[in-house]
A protein has these predicted regions:
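Bacterial Sec-pathway N-terminal export signals of envelope proteins
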Residues: 20-80, 231, 266-312, 383, ...
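Amphipathic alpha-helical coiled-coil scaffold segments and their short linker/junction regions
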Residues: 31-37, 87-134, 271-328, 473-478
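Sec/SRP-type N-terminal targeting helices
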Residues: 42-46, 59-60, 157-185, 211, ...
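Periplasmic alpha-helical coiled-coil/stalk elements that build and connect Gram-negative outer-membrane
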Residues: 53-55, 179-297, 396, 400, ...
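Acidic, low-complexity, intrinsically disordered peripheral segments
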Residues: 67-69, 74-99, 448-478
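Residues on the lipid-exposed face of transmembrane beta-strands in outer-membrane beta-barrel proteins
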Residues: 72, 151-155, 265, 350-354
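Transmembrane beta-strands of outer-membrane beta-barrel pores
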Residues: 72-76, 157, 332-336, 354-358, ...
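Short segments within alpha-helical structural elements
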Residues: 246-271, 412-469
Length: 478
């Protein structure tokens, strides 16, 4: 007695554990999970993060740039001091200096200045002497290697709108990234909805196949009793056996299809294929048509509009390349040892850069303008395509609603027919095969009905995706 209780307790524990660890997922939960874990969504999110960082970087592109410039330079030939170029100035200056010195000394001694004649003689004599001894060559500076280092600051003052356009382009690229992320989430939600509908369809068909198999098994048992009573021949019992075997095979196939459908759903959700997931929801037999709305929220159109904004900003940048650039510059040299020419340690100034001739400029402008026109055409084409798809989806919903209602009537009639054939068999007015045929027809009408429901709910999910609201399908599917 104790052992039986223990076995029962273990069995109950295992059943409860299986229930706890096998999660029941709703469509809304599946969509939320996929939008967090799906690789396509993650990739779009990473792209958006990159654009956010680039946008943040462009906010500082108007600040000055500070660079450390340092270099070791080796000159191929020694530097030469060009004394011949400054000879006249040196000779003239030295002669004048000699006259000034002699005149100063004479004035201090005598109190009078030298006569102009004497000054001229001193000037000419000094000039002749200096000219005679002045080198007639350019002397070399033996040091040929130099190390220089300093800080250079460059502050943009006017760049012809390049900075503003650059920030605007980065902002448009950020918006494109946001739109692309939303587009990725929309297509993921749509794919999840389609796969979830497929799982619900298989749940419904598995239930109907189980009911059909149960009826086939009862029919087989009834045929066995009739055979034992020698009321029917053996071949009619064989028909019942074959029908039951086919029913079992169909059930196994449906169960395997559901398992594969769950694998696909897990992959779309970005979770492990080994994670236990169970979905027992069946197709909603309601075919309520939603209020029809415009397609202005379509993600593809929004993405193309963002691309057009990028193209327009790119055109502004291309045009700004023909405008001048003005910078404030500063340079501080803190390491300039052994330079042959003594230069100031720092300088400040303005730098103007203006490309006066660029043979590619006109072609680039035309290409940028063409890109904007191309974006307009793509938006127009996509808008027409979306409008057409929306109208077709609306008509499909109406048509499939009517079709499913017709198939619903047919399957109910098939139920009545099966029941009548079974009663006739019980009264020996029909055969076992007649019942099997009626059950098969009943199953086929069920399949047609649920296939029409799948088509309707698929069209409904497609309609919401086209109009830019794919998650609205959760209002019609649990």
């Amino acid at each position: 007695m104790f052992m039986n209780i223990k076995k029962t307790s273990v069995s109950l524990f295992l059943m409860l554990s299986a229930k706890m660890f096998c999660q029941q997922f709703s469509l809304r939960y599946c969509i939320e999970k996929a939008q967090q874990n799906n690789t396509v969504v993650k990739l779009a999110g990473q792209s958006l993060e990159t654009r956010q960082k680039l946008f943040k970087a462009t906010q500082n592109n108007g600040l000055p740039k500070l660079d450390l410039l340092a270099g070791y330079n080796y000159i191929g030939e020694p530097l030469r001091v060009n004394l011949q170029q400054v000879k006249d100035g040196i000779v003239e200056g030295s002669a004048n200096q000699a006259v000034y010195s002699a005149n100063t000394v004479y004035q201090q001694v005598t109190g009078n200045q030298l006569s102009q004649q004497v000054q001229d003689i001193i000037y000419q004599t000094s000039k002749d002497i200096i000219s005679a001894v002045y080198p007639n060559y350019n002397p070399e500076i033996t040091k040929q290697s130099y190390f220089l280092a300093g800080l250079v600051v460059r502050q943009p003052i006017y760049l012809g709108g390049k900075l503003k356009s650059s920030r605007k382009l980065s902002e448009e690229q950020l918006k494109t990234g946001e739109t692309n992320l939303q587009s990725s989430k929309d297509i993921t939600a749509y794919n999840i909805a389609l796969q979830y509908i497929q799982v619900m369809y298989l749940n419904s068909m598995i239930e109907k196949q189980k009911n059909s198999l149960e009826s086939l098994q009862k029919n087989e048992a009834y045929a066995d009793n009739l055979l034992k009573a020698e009321i029917i021949p053996p071949y009619q019992k064989n028909w019942a056996d074959i029908a039951r075997a086919h029913g079992e095979t169909n059930l196994k196939s449906l169960v395997m299809e559901k398992e594969n459908a769950l694998f696909t759903l897990k992959d779309l959700m970005g979770i492990s294929l080994d994670e236990p997931v169970e979905i027992n929801e069946k197709l909603n037999e309601s075919t309520e048509i939603p209020p029809f709305i415009s397609s202005q929220n379509n993600a593809d159109i929004k993405l193309l509009q963002s691309k057009k904004a990028e193209a327009e900003t790119g055109l502004d940048i291309t045009k700004s390349l023909s405008r001048p650039n003005l910078f404030a510059i500063g340079n501080v040299q803190f390491f300039r040892k052994d330079l042959p020419v003594i230069t100031p340690p720092w300088l400040v100034g303005l730098e103007l850069q203006w490309t006066l001739f660029d043979p590619e400029r006109r072609s680039r402008n035309l290409a940028s303008e063409s890109l904007v026109k191309e974006a307009d055409l793509l938006i127009e084409q996509k808008q027409k395509s979306v409008n057409l798809a929306t109208k077709i989806a609306e008509n499909k919903l109406v048509s499939l609603k009517e079709q499913s209602e017709t198939f619903d009537i047919s399957r109910k009639q098939a139920y009545n027919t099966t029941e009548m054939v079974r009663k006739r068999m019980e009264n020996s007015l029909s055969s076992v095969k007649d019942v099997n045929d009626a059950l098969q027809l009943q199953y086929e009408t069920e399949k047609l009905y649920y296939t029409s429901l799948v088509a309707y709910q698929t069209a409904l999910a497609t309609y919401f995706y086209i109009t830019g609201n794919p998650e609205n399908i959760t209002n019609y599917i649990p």
